[in-house]
A protein has these predicted regions:
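Bacterial N-terminal signal peptides that target proteins for export
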Residues: 2-25
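N-terminal secretory targeting modules
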Residues: 38-221, 228-234, 429
């Protein structure tokens, strides 16, 4: 005979209800915690802007540095446009080429206004380990503490750096394509900026990171074409800027590791590409792909005032250089997209470098391009030569894409370069 269970007493019923409510609350708490944890996991630090550090060159080089040899008790304010936005920011200052410690007295950041101004409500003090300043060892970077500042995609930040001591400007980026201001005293928290002088180079500031939901990073590497030498100053019209706009909806950051004067095989206006890939490229968190556009200066500098004593490389020399870059990418499990070299007939004519172009140099460029197209050495290619050349005169840039010096694309040429990149091919999707 099976006995029916005895009915619960009122006290037992109350206890059971309390237990069920507790279980439900615990389950809800665990579920909410899981959601919160999942949300937190979506947020990560990613580089949203960079400028590759360069060493100062000797005064006898053909190009001026455009910056003073040193500053003391001055603030430098620099504007950067980020690719991705976020709710927290870190700044990176570089003493890569300093031979003595760099004393940072103070730093500040905020959303940029006009002519060096900062939106007052967004001004933030930058700290390093909780301190206003820091002593940066030679060769080292200084990474700031995270700071709360909501930054939108494609937003502009004004970064202010106060240098209280006599400070040689040993680490810089020559072709910033953005006005920077010098002012006396500590102006890191000032809304407006009382400038004593300006430049379009960058000093010490090498990277901005944001904490945000992101799907990784694309880095473009190259010379002055990538650095934006033909782009309008203060307009953010480098080809990487247009590419960043295309990738922003996918939450993918774009970093520009171009250096004007950069070369594949030699140093001068910065170290050669292979020597800086680990620092500028492979160290980036969430790296998805790299676009490489380099080699025209290797071909064209020899015999000019830039490299009078150097011999022009052979095709085998160039191929070996590319293969070393490819080998580094493979070792770091990074997708590498090779770009063909654009046409340059008539480049820099009427300047002290009017011998930059020569038919023999152009013949080598075309051989290099043939290898890039046909070797299958890269994971993919983008044919900038085909995009930018004049159909009626293939050795020259399309006039509408030419900045005017017949070497560097202008704003519309840069837009055409970015628009020609198949994003699926770029990312290997």
């Amino acid at each position: 005979m099976r006995l029916a269970p005895a009915p619960l007493t009122a006290k037992e019923t109350s206890r059971l209800g309390s237990s069920i409510r507790s279980a439900v609350l615990i389950a809800a708490f665990v579920f909410a915690s899981t959601l919160s944890s999942a949300h937190a996991e979506e947020q990560s630090w990613v580089g949203t802007w960079m400028a590759s550090p360069q060493p100062i060159w000797k005064p006898d080089f053909a190009l001026p540095t455009k910056i003073p040899q040193s500053v003391k008790d001055q603030t430098i304010r620099q504007v950067v446009r980020v690719s991705l936005g976020g709710d927290r920011v870190r700044l990176v200052f570089s003493n890569t080429y300093g031979d003595q410690p760099l004393r940072i007295g103070a730093a500040g950041v905020g959303l940029a206004g006009e002519n060096g101004a900062v939106e007052p409500a967004t001004i933030r003090k930058v700290t390093f380990g909780g301190k206003d300043g820091i002593l940066v060892p030679p060769g080292a970077p200084a990474v700031s503490d995270p700071l709360d500042l909501t930054v939108g995609p494609q937003a502009k930040l004004a970064v202010s750096l106060y240098l209280p001591e006599e400070t040689p400007l040993t680490t810089f980026h020559w072709d910033g394509r953005q006005t920077a201001w010098f002012g006396n005293g500590d102006l890191t928290r000032a809304k407006d900026f009382a400038a004593t002088s300006t430049t379009d180079a960058r000093m010490f500031l090498s990277e901005v990171l944001v904490e945000t939901r992101n799907n990784g990073t694309v880095v473009v590497v190259g010379d002055s074409i990538t650095d934006g030498n033909g782009a309008t100053v203060d307009a953010d019209t480098r080809w990487s800027d247009f590419l960043a706009k295309r990738l922003a909806p996918d939450h993918i950051a774009v970093l520009n590791a171009g250096i004007s004067g950069g070369r594949l095989l030699q140093d001068k206006m910065g170290v050669n590409v292979a020597a800086r890939l680990q620092r500028d490229v492979f160290s980036q968190p969430g790296l998805k792909a790299v676009v490489l556009l380099i080699g025209i200066n290797d071909i064209s500098w020899p015999g000019t005032d830039f490299a009078a004593a150097q011999q022009r490389p052979t095709l085998d020399d160039m191929i070996a250089g590319y293969q070393q870059v490819i080998a580094q990418a493979r070792a770091n499990n990074v997708r590498l997209v090779g770009a063909t070299l654009p046409p340059f007939e008539g480049a820099l004519s009427g300047t002290p470098l009017d011998d930059y172009y020569h038919p023999d140099k152009d013949a080598l460029r075309r051989e290099v391009n043939r290898w890039i197209r046909e070797s299958n050495a890269f994971d993919a290619i983008v044919d900038f030569d085909a995009i930018l050349r004049d159909p009626d005169h293939p050795a020259r840039l399309v006039p509408a894409f030419d900045s005017g010096d017949h070497l560097h694309p202008g704003d519309e040429g840069n837009r055409a370069m970015a628009d020609a990149i198949d994003l699926g091919v770029l990312l290997g999707r």
